[in-house]
Structure formats: C-alpha cells, structure tokens
C-alpha cells in the first residue's frame, strides 16, 4: 500500500509504516502541479537576472555576492559539496529514509521552487530503498540541518554513499543497478534540498515512535512489579485520578487496573501495609506526566513534518519571494529536549522499583532475588547497571537547546542545536528500554517466588513471553546477555497493544 504525500497531511502513524514497515510513497498530483508552477517562477527570476537570495546570490555571509546566469548550476553543486561536512557514525537507516520522505513532503507544499524531477528522485530513492549514508554530527540546527541534508543531496547527484540491499556502497552503484540517472541541480535546488530541519525531525519521529511503545511497555512491566511487591491496588482507584483531572494520569491508572484486574498478588489498603512507596503508588502520576510530554512532542512533530522549512519561500505566483527563518530548528529542539526529560523519568522511577525488588530490607523476597543468597549474587549488579544508565540519562537530558554558537561570520548568530537534542533523545530511549528490561527480569523472578499462578491473566501472558527470551535465575550467569535479549525483544515488540494476546490490558 502506498502513502500519498501532499505536503500537508503526513502523520506520525504514516511515518511509522514508512520507516518500520517499508511502505512506499507517491506524490499527490495537485501538489505536484503546485511544484511545477513554483518552478516556473524560479526560472523567470534567473532569466530576468533578478537579485534573489539563494537563486542568483551566494549563501550565508556571501548573500551579497551576485552570481552570473552561467554559474547558477555550478553554485548549486558547489553548495552541496562544500556543505557535506558531516562527521561521526551514520544515522540509523530509518532516519535517512525519513529524511528523504520529509524533504519530498516539504517540497510538495509548492513554495520551494524545485523541479518536479527533484521530488520524483527523492520518491524513487524511498521506494527503491536507497538510503543515504548521513553522518550524525555536524549540524547546528540552523540554517536547518545543512551538513546532514547535504549528504542526502549528494546521493541524488550520484556522489556519496548509500545503504542499499543490506550494504554500504557508492551511490552510483545503487543508481546503476536500479537504472536511475543522477540529476544535475539547477537554480535554487541545492539550497532547497539542504535548508531545513529534516534530520532532526526524522530522528525525532523515530525517537517518538520508540518512546511511545516504550511508555506502554513501562506500564506493563510496572504492573508486574506491583504484583511482585504485593502492591496496594487502591492507589489506582479511578476516583483518586479523576480528582486531579489530568487525562493522561487517569488513562495510566485505568490501564493498570485493567492489567491487574484479576491478580491475586495485589493487596488492599491496610491488608499488609497502609500505603506503598512513591515508585509504586505514584506510577499514574509519573507515567502520566511522561504521556503529557509524548502528546506534546507528537503534536510538534506533525506540524514540522508538514512544514515549509526552506529559504527563501515563493508565494503568490512569484509576486513574493521572501527570505525568512523557517529553517530554524528551535521548536523541534525544545520538543526533543522535553522528550529527553519525559523519557528519562520513566527510567528514574523504574530503577527505584528495581531497588525495591532486590533490597531485602524493603521486601520479604530473597536478597537480590538470589537462588542462594551469599553464594550467588543474583540480581545485585543488575541494579548497579540500571543506576548507571539512569545517571547517564541525567547527563544526556541536559537541554541542548539552551546552547547557541554563532556561525557564518556572525550572519547566523543564533542556532537551535536541535539535531543534538534529537540524537540524545534517541540515546536516552535506548537506555530507558534497558532499565525496563532489568526491571522485567527482576519482576519475573519475584513473580516466581510469589506464584505465577497468582498473576493476572495479562501479566501471566507477558511473563511467559518474557521467559521465552530469558530463563529463570536458578544460578548466577552472565546477565548482560539477558538484559540485551529482553531489550531487543521489547524493541521488536513495538508496543504491548500489539504484543499481548489478551486484549483486556488496553
């Protein structure tokens, strides 16, 4: 099934299908007509010799240098080559695929001035699964993602490298095998390709997709811990959460009640104790607040996915060609920094639940869930590992968006650092997943001491799925492998909505 790009309607759900399920794209004919009409304006500007930034002038600090008509093509090619200054490891292939999709989508708004040929070439790369190799480092997030997008533009010209059929090859290898000809950029097209926020946004979309799945999984894993610690179910009563009024908090409490509705391991207020520690009792409040962050981030991503972030932009049939600053990544920089904090908190509270599972002073379980306390250490060092990841997240959660370093001889004197924020958000999510994996391993072990038959229908199903990934702890072993196995499984599971056999959970 193909997803139609219009420049206005792309959603996160569609991006999920495009990035993770490999669906193809096509362009809306009406939007393509707008692209063609806008291109005519650019060609007339060049023909008439008008002075317009980025079309007949240099770039950045060189904006006052007039470019002769015969040099317009060379200007675009020089721009791409000189700006391809990315460094470091490449973005995940899903991100570079997302960059192609988002760049095509923004051009389909019909205000960038490129030829339809350029849009079609981007779509060909998506549909043939030719994905640019794009280094992760080197973007200031204004003027957009210049370096990363230059590496994307290179491959359209038959230069640079691509991921193709599971290999990293020169772009011309893939183009030749697919029977495609590299394109030669004309006026404005180089700038239109690289002036935008598509690297930070593509990475942000992938991060959001993973974060959403992780947040659902965190609720299910926390529910297993509640059982392992014989938590008090009253704290999740609907009346408590409606009294505060946050929808996300109410929803988390509702899902946990559904997950645990037939559990024989939860307790009532006063049965074993009057109240639980915050890491159990306040799960809806804390996880719910993280869902508030996720909802905010999704809203901003969907705006940016359909935004014209080029410069200059062309309006009213060419009557207005305006230099603006839509390439500035501040909205996504803030959103990604917010995502970092919201997701890091899920690991913070998870690590505290891990401590309650392994600390014999806080429960009546075997110390560190060890099969032979003293002779065998059990889950002792797993808690250390979780604490390390949580601490690392606190460093990564420092806002990238509060920094700015002037560039281009102070012409570009304020930048967003949004791509750094996006990259760090993705790193944090990987760490969160591993912390949750440790909690799950400990919660499964605690469930065995409590009696698996007493678990809820939902958590029991999840327990058995988890045990297919890692065995019960009967002896000390290399737990690093267990943690990674659960983490990989959770990532592949997408979300508990899709993974569980029992629909009662959600």
Swiss-Prot record:
GO terms for biological process: L-histidine catabolic process; L-histidine catabolic process to glutamate and formamide; L-histidine catabolic process to glutamate and formate. One of its GO terms (cellular component) is cytoplasm. Its EC number is 4.3.1.3. Contains an active site 4-methylidene-imidazol-5-one (MIO), which is formed autocatalytically by cyclization and dehydration of residues Ala-Ser-Gly. The keyword Repressor does not apply. One of its GO terms (molecular function) is histidine ammonia-lyase activity. Gene3D superfamilies: Fumarase/aspartase (Central domain), Fumarase/aspartase (N-terminal domain). It is an enzyme of class 4 (lyase). Pathway: Amino-acid degradation; L-histidine degradation into L-glutamate; N-formimidoyl-L-glutamate from L-histidine: step 1/3. It comes from the Bacteria. It catalyses: L-histidine = trans-urocanate + NH4(+). Its main location: cytoplasm. There is a cross-link at residues 142-144 (5-imidazolinone (Ala-Gly)). The modification 2,3-didehydroalanine (Ser) is found at residue 143. It is found in: Cytoplasm. The keyword Cell membrane does not apply. Keywords: Cytoplasm, Histidine metabolism, Lyase. Belongs to the PAL/histidase family. This is Histidine ammonia-lyase. The gene is hutH.
């Amino acid at each position: 099934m193909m997803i139609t790009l219009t420049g206005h309607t792309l959603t996160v759900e569609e991006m999920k299908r495009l990035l993770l399920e490999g669906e193809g794209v096509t362009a809306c004919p009406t939007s393509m007509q707008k692209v063609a009409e806008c291109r005519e304006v650019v060609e007339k500007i060049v023909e008439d010799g008008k002075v317009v930034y980025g079309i007949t002038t240099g770039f950045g600090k060189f904006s006052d240098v007039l470019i002769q008509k015969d040099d317009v093509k060379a200007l675009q090619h020089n721009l791409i080559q000189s700006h391809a200054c990315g460094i470091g490891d490449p973005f995940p292939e899903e991100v570079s695929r997302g960059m192609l999709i988002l760049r095509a989508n923004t051009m389909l708004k019909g205000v960038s001035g490129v030829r339809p040929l350029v849009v079609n070439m981007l779509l060909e790369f998506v549909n043939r699964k030719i994905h640019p190799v794009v280094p992760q480092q080197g973007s200031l997030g204004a003027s957009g993602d210049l370096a990363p997008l230059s590496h994307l533009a290179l491959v359209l010209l038959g230069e640079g490298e691509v991921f193709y059929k599971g290999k990293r090859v020169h772009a011309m290898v893939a183009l030749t095998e697919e029977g495609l000809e590299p394109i030669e950029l004309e006026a404005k097209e180089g700038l239109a390709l690289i002036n935008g926020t598509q690297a930070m946004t593509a990475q942000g979309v992938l991060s959001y997709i993973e974060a959403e799945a992780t947040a659902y999984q965190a609720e299910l894993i926390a529910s297993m811990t509640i059982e392992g610690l014989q938590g008090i179910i009253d704290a999740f009563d609907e009346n408590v959460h409606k009294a505060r009024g946050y929808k996300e908090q109410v929803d988390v409490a509702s899902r946990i009640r559904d997950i645990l509705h037939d559990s024989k391991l939860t307790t009532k207020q006063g049965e074993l104790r009057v109240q639980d520690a915050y890491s159990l009792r306040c799960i809806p409040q804390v996880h719910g607040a993280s869902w508030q962050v996720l909802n905010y981030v999704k809203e901003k991503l969907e705006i940016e996915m359909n935004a014209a972030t080029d410069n200059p932009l062309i309006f009213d049939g060419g009557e207005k060609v305006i230099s603006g600053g839509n390439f500035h990544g501040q909205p996504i920089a803030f959103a990604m920094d917010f995502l970092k904090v919201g997701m890091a908190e899920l690991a913070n509270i998870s690590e505290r639940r891990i401590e309650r599972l392994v600390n014999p002073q806080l429960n009546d379980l075997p110390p560190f869930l060890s099969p032979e306390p003293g002779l065998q250490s059990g889950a002792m060092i797993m808690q250390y590992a979780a604490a390390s990841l949580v601490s690392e997240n606190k460093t990564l959660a420092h806002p990238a968006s509060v920094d700015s370093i002037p560039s281009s001889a102070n012409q570009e004197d304020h930048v967003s650092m949004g791509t750094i924020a996006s990259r760090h958000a993705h790193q944090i999510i990987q760490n969160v997943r591993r912390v949750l994996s440790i909690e799950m391993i400990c919660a499964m072990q605690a469930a065995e001491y409590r009696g698996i038959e007493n678990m809820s229908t939902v958590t029991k199903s999840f327990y058995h799925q988890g045990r297919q990934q890692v065995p019960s702890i009967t002896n000390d072993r290399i737990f690093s492998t267990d943690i990674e196995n659960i983490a990989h499984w959770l990532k592949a599971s997408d979300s508990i909505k899709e993974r569980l056999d029992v629909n009662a959970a959600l």
